Design a protein with these regions (language model features):
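Active-site mouth loops of central-metabolism enzymes
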Residues: 1-15, 67-80, 101-107
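N-terminal binding-site loop/beta-alpha segment at the start of enzyme catalytic domains
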Residues: 1-61, 93, 121
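Short, acidic/polar
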Residues: 11-24, 73-91, 111-114, 138-143
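Beta/alpha (TIM)-barrel catalytic core signal, keyed to glycine-rich beta->alpha loops juxtaposed to Asp/Glu
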Residues: 14, 103-211
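Conserved, mostly hydrophobic/aromatic
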Residues: 17, 24, 32, 47, ...
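Short amphipathic alpha-helices and their capping/turn segments at secondary-structure boundaries
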Residues: 48-55, 83-88, 170-179
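Active-site gating/metal-coordination segments in enzymes
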Residues: 57, 73-101, 107, 159, ...
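A short, structured active-site edge motif that brings together acidic residues
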Residues: 59-71, 156-159
Length: 211
């Protein structure tokens, strides 16, 4: 996506995006995760354009995107609006996984879960995921979906790696209870666990404080 001076300064251009995705597919990687807010939507655009230019068929990739950091957060109106924008930017008519980026304190859980369930029933989304919230909030959302016969979450994207293991206390046990898969973010602690020296002179190492 397009770099911003104050958000994800380490992003790559379109040509590099295509090389990275092409190499990933050739290496057996097929899960591509993005969000409507990454690089202000241009991350989705670059990914969709790369898949088209590389001639990668839709059934060869698992596409995931997220919703929350937008006007209306997780209201029904916002979800319905944002999914259409995401699908258009990615150049597809469905997502394999749609993730709520955060818990929305301003919208009733029932409204959010019903809206997400409607996307699954409409064929715009195949599965639902959540990210970065308290375990009790995730549990309450699952209970709400279960009680109403709505689609439950099948994945949790939490902050989890060998250095940061807080979610082993409560979130991961809740995920086990519901048979929810983990798709952690920063699994290599922003690269710190993947190189012999703690720091490097890369733009991401200098500007990304996420461990």
């Amino acid at each position: 996506g397009e770099a911003s001076p104050d958000f994800h300064q380490w992003t790559i251009d379109q040509d590099t995006t295509e090389r990275v995705i092409g190499h990933a597919i050739d290496s057996g990687v097929n899960f591509i995760d993005t969000a409507n807010c990454y690089a202000f939507g241009t991350s989705e655009t670059y990914i969709g354009r790369a898949l088209k230019r590389l001639g990668i068929s839709r059934d060869r990739v698992v596409l995931a995107s997220k919703v929350y950091f937008n006007e209306g957060h997780l209201s029904q109106e916002a979800i319905n609006h944002e999914i259409d924008g995401t699908l258009k930017r990615l150049g597809t008519d469905y997502l394999d996984l749609y993730i709520i980026h955060r818990f929305d304190y301003g919208t009733p859980i029932e409204e959010t879960m019903e809206a997400l369930d409607a996307l699954v029933k409409a064929g715009k989304v195949r599965a639902l995921g959540a990210s970065e919230m308290y375990a009790y909030q995730f549990h309450n959302m699952q209970v709400t979906a279960e009680a109403n016969g709505w689609t439950k979450f099948t994945s949790m994207q939490c902050h989890y790696n060998l250095l940061y293991r807080e979610d082993e206390r409560e979130m991961i046990p809740v995920c086990r209870q519901y048979g929810v898969a983990l798709t952690p973010y920063s699994p290599m602690a922003s690269g710190h666990l993947a190189r012999p020296k703690w720091n490097s002179d890369s733009k991401r190492s200098i500007t990304d404080n996420t461990m």
